[in-house]
């Protein structure tokens, strides 16, 4: 017998104690092997959930840099329309758009959002004027999801002559930017998502005025997993990338 019962507990017999000493090292080796296995799997696949627009305009063009730095981490991209709630059990990291407060999640700010009036170079050179903000009244306004952003922009800049209740509405930011790039009107473009189009010369900002919002892009994960190797590595890479690019943009504007 290995055990003897005393009241509601079990005690090792002499034979049980001897057996335990014999197998103790085996269990220690098993635990060590399990830890190594978990460590290897931790450095394996990394699933990221994020909005399609952010994936297309920001992450995918930069992913080669991460793959070069971390060749042992296989990134899996999961594009979803919804932000909150997309950090499911099969997802390690998510990109959320909002104000940064989600219970049980660690959220690190990537980019503060501001919106910029943007149009194609051809539209700027067209027959309709585009020299001052009030000239927006001569152009089609392109809307992202709703008309609230243009309404707020017009209110803050005293544009009583601009009709913000007309113009097509698109369900994705990338669609608005593409419409603007094809000369269909003027968009209020997100500073992060529009940057590739601006850099490529497909969109230009005819005015200096911007609309600051209370929203930002955040890289989020479950608090209990925040220090896991692959998650921390990817988060740190994103934050470093975002901060360095914001410095580059500020320096570029300063030199203009």
Model region roles, listed by residue range:
Residues 1-12, 203:
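A short LG(V/I)-centered, amphipathic sequence patch enriched
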Residues 11-39:
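Alpha-helical "hinge/linker" immediately C-terminal to small N-terminal DNA-binding modules
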Residues 13-16, 86, 136, 178-183, ...:
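Hydrophobic residues within well-ordered alpha-helices
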Residues 43-103, 251-256:
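Central regulatory/effector-binding core of bacterial HTH transcription factors
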Residues 68, 72, 191-200, 210-256:
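C-terminal effector-binding regulatory domain of bacterial HTH transcription factors
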Residues 76-169:
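Acidic, Gly/Pro-rich loop/turn segments at junctions of secondary structure
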Residues 102-109, 197-207:
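Ligand-binding "clamshell"
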Residues 162-205, 212, 243:
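Hydrophobic hinge/microswitch elements
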């Amino acid at each position: 017998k290995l055990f003897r019962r005393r009241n509601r507990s079990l005690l090792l017999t002499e034979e049980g104690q001897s057996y335990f000493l014999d197998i103790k090292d085996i269990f220690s080796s098993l635990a060590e092997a399990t830890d190594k296995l978990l460590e290897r799997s931790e450095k394996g696949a990394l699933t990221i959930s994020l909005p399609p627009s952010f994936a297309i305009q920001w992450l995918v063009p930069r992913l080669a840099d991460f793959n070069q730095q971390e060749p042992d981490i296989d990134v899996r991209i999961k594009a979803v329309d919804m932000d909150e709630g997309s950090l499911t059990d099969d997802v390690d990291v998510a990109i959320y758009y909002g104000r940064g407060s989600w219970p049980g999640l660690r959220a690190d700010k990537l980019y503060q959002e501001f919106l910029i009036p943007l149009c194609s170079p051809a539209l700027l050179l067209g027959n309709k004027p585009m020299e001052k903000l009030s000239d927006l009244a001569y152009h089609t306004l392109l809307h992202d999801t709703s008309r609230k952003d243009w309404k707020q922009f017009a209110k803050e800049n005293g544009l009583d002559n601009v009709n913000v209740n007309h113009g097509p509405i698109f369900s994705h930011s990338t669609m608005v930017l593409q419409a603007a790039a094809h000369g269909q009107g003027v968009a209020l473009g997100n500073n992060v998502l529009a940057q590739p189009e601006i850099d490529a010369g497909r969109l230009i900002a005819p005015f200096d005025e911007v609309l600051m919002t209370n929203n930002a892009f955040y890289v989020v994960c479950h608090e209990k997993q925040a220090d896991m190797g692959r998650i921390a590595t990817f988060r740190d890479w994103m934050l470093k990338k975002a901060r360095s690019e914001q410095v580059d943009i500020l320096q570029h504007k300063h030199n203009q």
